[in-house]
Structure formats: structure tokens, C-alpha cells
Amino acid sequence: MNQERSVTRNSLAQGELLKSRSARALGTTGLALMLGVALGGAAFAQSAPVGVPDKSFPESVTSTKDGTLYAGSFNLGGVVKASPGGKAEQFIQPGAAGSRSTLGVLADEKGGLLYVCSNDITGFGVPGPGDTKGAWLKVFDLASGAPKGSYGLPDPKSLCNDIAVGSDGSAYVSDSFTPNVYKLKPGAAALEAWATDPLLAPAKDGVGLDGIAVGADGNLYVTTFIPAKLFKIAIKDGKAGAVTELKTSRAIDHADAMRAFGDSFLLIEGAGRLAKVTVKGDEAQVDTIAEGLAEPVSVTQVGNTGWVAEGKLSYIIGDNKGKDPGPFTLKPVSLTK
């Protein structure tokens, strides 16, 4: 009972923190919760947006090389799947394997796995499915959707945000409310606190770790949402090395999801932009690809197209709560500009 009360207090604190972030992030009209990005490599292209269920508030999107898209739901939970040219259909049922609200999702084709960040966000005023407490990394079979594993983030304050997978099959997980990056080695029974650093800690009234990606150089890169920053975490023999803040060529606004894009990265900025980030040494060149996006939260690459999830989260936890958010889509953006 005492543990449950502690979880409830932490959930409420997270809710207040998110409300504060809403006001600071996008004023009275927008909110972008920290989201995941995933990489796919096929040349499949589609010009029309892909619809997802009404009032599902997509919080993350990922893909496979054939152009299949997977999107999680912030409020309903579960994961929907859309084959190239097809409609979104339920793939992971809400509440499956004890899951709650779905944040980051990542398809790992090499390992045949779908990673899902599951969180109890009742403190945000969003009950979601089920009654599991805390933050979890859920793992499902990418082909069948069958549950493959469930791994709790150990800190009761944790918020499982996003996932990256290294060349050895290890999964890295960002935690928005602690200064920790967790690691799940292949075959491991639990997550380990892989990297912890004061630079990664959430600022007062801010939101910490968000996007996460393994770069072409083999190092790990992460974003923090408020204040918006980029960091490199060196990887040597599988262990975390130095944490370095990168100097950006322009100011970035609410740095959200990030994933590898060739030798660079794709970055979602919560204020409505998709950008390309190229790192050289301790500096990062930031070039805008698209702007004017409606509360974007995630992106995944399929060939020359970036599929952006416009989460419109202000309509469920922000200043637009109670208003009609309109239809939800995954929006295609050309990456050849």
C-alpha cells in the first residue's frame, strides 16, 4: 500500500510537470510529448497521409524496410499497424502483456522484435488501459505480436520515453524523469542503469531525456526536451563513456525524437519542425527539413520519406483539452530537400 501511494504521488508530480511543460513549450495551442523515431530503409514512397484511429493521439511511430508503419497510442495504448497503401489495423491490443499507455515504439527487424515504452500516466489525467503501475519496456514479436518480455524501469519516478538498438542487439532506453539511460542486453532478465550523468538530469520544471539513437560512429546520441539540448554518450566495449553536450548551429526548440539517418540524424522539434542533424566533433549542424507541423511527436524513415506522427497532445493534456482535435494521420515529408 505504501508503495502504491508513492507511485501515485510520483504520477501526480509528473502530471504537474507535464502541465508546466505544456505552457512553456507551445503556448496556448500546442504540446508535443517526447517521442520516438525509428529507421527504415526501403525506397517505398507514398504521398498520401496514413490515417490512424480517431482520438487515438499517436505518440510514436516506427517502420520496417517494406514501408509498414507501426504507431502507438498515448491514451488508448496498444499499437496499430499499416501495410504500404493500407489502413491502420490493431496489431498489439490495448493492455496486452500488462501494458498501459504507449509512448516510444521501435521495430528491430534484425532481432525480429517490437519494443514498446509502456507507462502509467494517470497522473497526467489519462487512465489508459489496465492497472499496471510504473514505467516498463515491453517487447513483442515483430511478426506475430506475441509478448516476448517485460522489463520495469527501477525508479518510481521513471517515464519510459524512447528506444534505440545497437549493432549487438542491445536495447537502450531513455528515461525522461531521471538522468538515466537504461540498457537491455540480449538475453538479460532486467534493465541495467547503463549511463547516469548530471548533464542528463531533468532541469527544475523541465523534462529530461527524450530522443535516443545510435549513430553511424557507434556512439549513442540523446536529446533533452526542456531545455532543448543534444548530447553524445561515448560507447566503448559496450560501456558508457564520456557524456558531451553538442553545440548546435542554431537554437533548437523542444528537442524530441531522434534517429539515425545515414551519417546524420532526423530530429523532431516540438514547436513544429523536422530537422536533419549532422554531427562533427562536438558540434551539430541543424538544417530544417519541414516546419509548420501540427504538434509533431515522432518520425520514422522509409526510403526518401519521413513519416511524421502529429500527436496533437494539447487536445488531451494541454490547453486545447476538450476541443475537437480533428483526424489523426501519419504525415509523409520528403527527405530529399
Model regions and ranges:
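Bacterial N-terminal signal peptides
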Residues: 28-40
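Beta-propeller blade signature
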Residues: 132-142, 325-336
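Beta-rich, blade/repeat-based domains predominating
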Residues: 53-69, 96-121, 153-171, 199-220, ...
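Asp-box/WD-like beta-propeller blade repeats and closely related beta-sheet repeat scaffolds
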Residues: 130-168
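Conserved beta-strand positions in repeat-built beta-propeller and related beta-rich domains
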Residues: 54, 70-75, 108, 114-131, ...
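A short beta-strand motif characteristic of beta-propeller blades
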Residues: 46-52, 88-95, 146-153, 192-204, ...
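Short loop/turn segments that connect beta-strands within beta-propeller blades
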Residues: 83-87, 141-146, 185-189, 234-239, ...
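N-terminal secretory signal peptides that target proteins for export/translocation
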Residues: 1-24
